[in-house]
């Protein structure tokens, strides 16, 4: 466990250093948001199950699923938030997720992600320093819950680097809700490809005559 923590700490310190020195390069590639969300959900549900925590997707309404952006960093941001929602939750607790989009114009959408947990929440004093490196709620918290104290600073930096925003509401002993908004370009080429495939599939059976042969008079009448 100690070696695992040390490796995680070293990796996150390096990541934080890259973000601060503007060395992190975002991808600009096509990806399917639904497939990405499905991958995240499979991993998170497995982690949650170990503590009897229920994942409830209240809403998923992303119409433009073929987007252009940095899926690797999107995945890391969402995974960080959901992992914390499990880590700081109560046994047999719940996590409520909502994902939807707002279309800004013909070429751009903003995807909104909301994560609400029934966990231990945060004190008002800790809320003011949640994005500070190595911040912890109280002495010994890292021993109890694990983590390096760099997850939230990295998450905030990545969200802002992608042109998005992150905010939260929290009440001690009552849970925390995080809100993330990230803009993406719509991948029109992929949308057109899927539309064309659908048209070809529909055209392939359009106007086809089907002969049904029955040896029973009642079936023939039906």
State what each model feature region is.
Residues 39, 46, 50, 58, ...:
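Disordered, acidic interdomain junction associated with two-component signaling
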Residues 27-34, 49, 54-65, 102:
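Conserved catalytic submotifs in the C-terminal HATPase_c
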Residues 122-136:
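Short conserved segment of the HATPase_c
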Residues 17-28:
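Helix-loop junction within the histidine kinase core
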Residues 1-6:
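Short alpha-helical segment of the dimerization/phosphotransfer core of two-component systems
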Residues 146, 150-151, 155:
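Short alpha-helical Gxxx[C/S/T] motif in the catalytic ATP-binding
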